[in-house]
Structure formats: structure tokens, C-alpha cells
């Protein structure tokens, strides 16, 4: 695997908050903007060589392109395995559960929450640590300091991962597993709620309306409300 070291110059606006770095899509589309921020994250972490990184997002515009960049950079920086949701999809709570369930080192969640998406909308990248929660301030502060001085980032020359195909692929020498974005989370919900009782409620004639217009809610609603409870 040939690792490429690409020269870059810092951007002055890459200060993450507790919800990561949220900017307009047009900002993220600037040359090396995504790469600078991802490299700053990796440079601020220790002990991940050969470890697992979870990647997924809410499916908004620019999600796929950023995920392909993140996969190649994860390989170049020494991760041994990436778990990515099919279609590049993982809701924030599902990503948190996948991180914990698979004992991953951490994860990249690509979302701007309720902010509007689209080419003229918003995009975001957030790093979650091994317990599934957001990176603490000591990490986000370190990331910001690194973004101010970054002059190179690492990547590899590799084809895009087929995000729609569940199964194992490779990016360079790194294993990439495309997983069902809903399965682990739906199984978790069955341990937290009495699905038999909820099924009985629906069978009794109970009806409800569910608004799945926000972010990535739809696939989870289909799997849980229709397939498991309907």
C-alpha cells in the first residue's frame, strides 16, 4: 500500500464544538478542507494503529464523497478496519451503538443534525470516542490547534468502496466492512423496550402517525415500526 503525503495549508475556521464541525457544504467543498480536518482528528489521537473505525452519516448531500475520503485517509493513517453503514448511512445513536457493540476505537459521524441539507445547505463531521459519545473538550481543543498548523495529510490511491454492497472489501491493506445500518440498533431497541407489548397494542387497533422527515429516521422507522412491530 503506497501512502501519499499531500501538502496543504491551514484553514482558520475549523474549530469543532460538541456537535463537531458544521459548515456550509460549499465550505467543505473547498480544496483539502475535509482532508485537513480529518487529518487533524487523526493527529490528535493515539493508539489506534490496527484498530476499528466506524463511519456513517445521515445521507445528506456530500455524505458519500466525504466518506470515501475518510476511508482512504483512515487506511493511510493506520486503522486496520472500517465499519461503514450501507449507503454511507448511520444515525447518530446507531453509530454510537455500533462503536460500543463492535468495540471500535471511535467513529466519524457525518451529520449536521436538523440543519437543512443540499448543495446550498449544511454539512458536518463529528468524532465520537470508544464509548460512543462525543469527543471530550481535550480532544476537540487538540483538533482545533492542529488545524491551525497542519501542512500535510495522508491518503492512499485506491478505488471507491462500493457502499451499497453489504460485505467485506478492502481499501489498500485496510479491511472495509459495509454493514446493515439498522440491524444492530434495532436489536438494541428490542432489549430496551417490550416489543411484544407494543405489537399487541398495534394489533388491538391502535393507530399512530410518524413523521420521518428528519435526517436519517426513515430506514429505522421501516425496520422497527413496520418490519418488527407492524
Segments (PLM) and residue ranges:
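Well-ordered alpha-helical segments embedded in enzymatic catalytic cores
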Residues: 33-40, 94, 185-188
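Glycine-rich phosphate/diphosphate-binding loop of Rossmann-like nucleotide-binding domains
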Residues: 31-44, 48, 56-69, 74-76, ...
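Short strand-loop junctions, especially beta-strand C-caps/beta-turns
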Residues: 21, 26, 56-60, 130, ...
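Generic structural signal for well-ordered alpha-helical scaffold segments
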Residues: 39-46, 96, 100, 190-197
